[in-house]
């Protein structure tokens, strides 16, 4: 897919993967599902769900490294800054030939890398982020989208990046 095609599909993901309500129990269900998907596939990832800057779910699976928690934080910061997936922000920067520094951000606190996705609640907006780190950025993004689609009962083939 081209950058434009990916951005179009991600926009559809961000419009579709929204909750009517999201609480700590929902965070647990989503986090546990991500854990199970990653474990079944032997993926060495860190998984984080944060609401209103409060961490509500975190696990690092075998193979994840201490660096993954820092990547999680920096990717999540991109989502909470722009209220869009970190992969969409990364692709937009790439398309524009810009870096995060061109937008006044620092690499120490923000990562232009896919894998973090906004948690949207209908009628409210972005209330947090769900983040995966440990795979190539497109795969991190796809894993999060898969878990969100399954949690919300949406068909994955209509949403996933190919």
From Swiss-Prot:
Stored InterPro entries: PduO/GlcC-like, PduO/GlcC-like_sf, YBR137W-like
One Pfam family, short name: HbpS-like
Domain of life: Bacteria
Family statement drawn from the similarity comment of this UniProt entry: Belongs to the UPF0303 family.
The protein, known as: UPF0303 protein Arad_3071
Gene source species: Rhizobium rhizogenes (strain K84 / ATCC BAA-868)
């Amino acid at each position: 897919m081209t950058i434009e095609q990916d951005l179009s599909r991600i926009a559809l993901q961000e419009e579709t993967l929204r909750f009517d309500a999201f609480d700590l129990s929902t965070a647990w269900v989503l986090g546990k599902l991500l854990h199970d998907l990653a474990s079944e596939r032997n993926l060495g990832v860190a998984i984080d769900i944060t609401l209103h800057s409060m961490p509500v779910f975190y696990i690092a699976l075998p193979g994840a490294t201490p660096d993954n928690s820092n990547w999680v934080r920096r990717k999540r910061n991109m989502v909470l800054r722009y209220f869009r997936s970190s992969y969409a922000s990364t692709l937009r920067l790439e398309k524009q030939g810009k870096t995060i520094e061109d937008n006044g951000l620092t690499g120490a606190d923000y990562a232009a890398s896919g894998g973090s996705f906004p948690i949207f609640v209908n009628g409210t907006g972005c209330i947090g982020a769900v983040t995966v780190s440990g795979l190539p950025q497109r795969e991190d993004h796809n894993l999060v989208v898969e878990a969100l689609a399954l949690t919300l009962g949406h068909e994955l083939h209509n949403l996933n990046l190919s």
